[in-house]
Every structure is written in structure tokens, then in C-alpha cells.
Amino acid sequence: MPTPKKGPRLASSPAHERLMLANMATSLFQNGRITTTLPKAKRLRPLAERLITFAKRGDLHSRRRVMRVIRNKSVVHILFTQIAEQMEQREGGYTRIVKIAPRVGDAAPAAVIELVTEPVAKKAVVKEAEAAAKVAEEEAPAVEAEATEAAEAVEAVEAPVEETAAAEAEAPAEEAADAEKAE
């Protein structure tokens, strides 16, 4: 567990605070998200992230270290099998704290702490895609210029063929007209 902050504790004694954080961590892993006060959520986050890191290791020693905090074996099993697999690609930042409206009874600042289950957006892949898009944009004008040149060349080749075909069609007509005049 991280070094406690100086000043008043969340509960009346250090033992009570440890038990309260362990119970909140158990509830977080069972339900995926819990609603609590903001100071409790901020104190729970480092503990929960450390337990998830142990679960990702997956060895016996890590399981025993988690069992020191979370006494419920079924929750430990869920943590090591399901949650650790979900967080396999993530290198930290397993939890998210979202502030919500103050609590109705005493106006205490409330928050929701939840496990982050969205897949990790790979930055390297995004950078490679952006680089490929830039290269494609640079090559696109060159390809378009080549395509227009090729189209113009095809039109130039087709135009003389059409002109010669038209000239040949006119030539017999002219010869026929000359022959009629001669007769």
C-alpha cells in the first residue's frame, strides 16, 4: 500500500482505513465501478492499480500478495482471470475517476471510480497511418499528373487516326465527284 498522506485519515485509525480501502477495492473488482467520495476514490486508485499490476504478473507470489488485501477468493479469481486479461495491453492507468454531483445528504464531493476497459489506442500505429497518408498525398499529384499526360497522349494518338479516317472517307467521295465531272 502506498505511503499514507499526512494529515487526518479517511477513517478513525490506520487499520480501519486499510480495511475500508480493501473493501472498496473488492467492490470495484466485483462491479467494475463504484460511487464514493472524491477523497476515498483518490486514495483507492493507487491501491487498485497496484493490485491489477500484481494480477497481470500472474505468479503465485503475486496472488498471495493480492490475497493479503482482498480476502474474497472469488474476487481474486476474477481479478487474475478476467480483469488481468482485459488490462494486458495497458501499461498503467487501469482506473478512471469521474467527478459527479455532490452527495445529497451532506454535500460531500462525490466521484465514480471505474475500471478502464476500452482497448488501448496504439500511438505507433496512428503515427504510421498518418505517415502513410502523407506519402499517399504526395504521390497522388504525381500519379494524377502521369494519368493526365497518358490521357492526353491517348487522345493525341486517337485524334490523328480519326482525322486520317475522315480524310480517307472524303477522298473516295472526292474521287467519285471528279469521276462524275469527267464523264
Swiss-Prot record:
Q: Which GO terms describe its cellular component?
A: cytosolic large ribosomal subunit
Acidic residues compositional bias: what residue ranges?
A: 138-149
User: Known Pfam families for this protein?
Assistant: Ribosomal_L17
One record GO biological process: translation
Query: Which SUPFAM superfamilies does this entry report, sorted A to Z?
Result: Prokaryotic ribosomal protein L17
Q: Where do Low complexity bias regions lie?
A: 150-170
Residue ranges of the region described as Disordered = 137-183
Which Gene3D superfamilies does the entry mention? Answer: Ribosomal protein L17 (3.90.1030.10)
InterPro entries reported for this sequence: Ribosomal_bL17, Ribosomal_bL17_CS, Ribosomal_bL17_sf
Q: GO molecular function: any one? A: structural constituent of ribosome
Keywords annotated in UniProt = Ribonucleoprotein, Ribosomal protein
Signal peptide boundaries: none
Return the similarity comment. Belongs to the bacterial ribosomal protein bL17 family.
Partners and quaternary state?
Answer: Part of the 50S ribosomal subunit. Contacts protein L32.
Under what name is this protein listed? Large ribosomal subunit protein bL17
Lineage, uppermost ranks = Bacteria, Bacillati, Actinomycetota, Actinomycetes, Bifidobacteriales
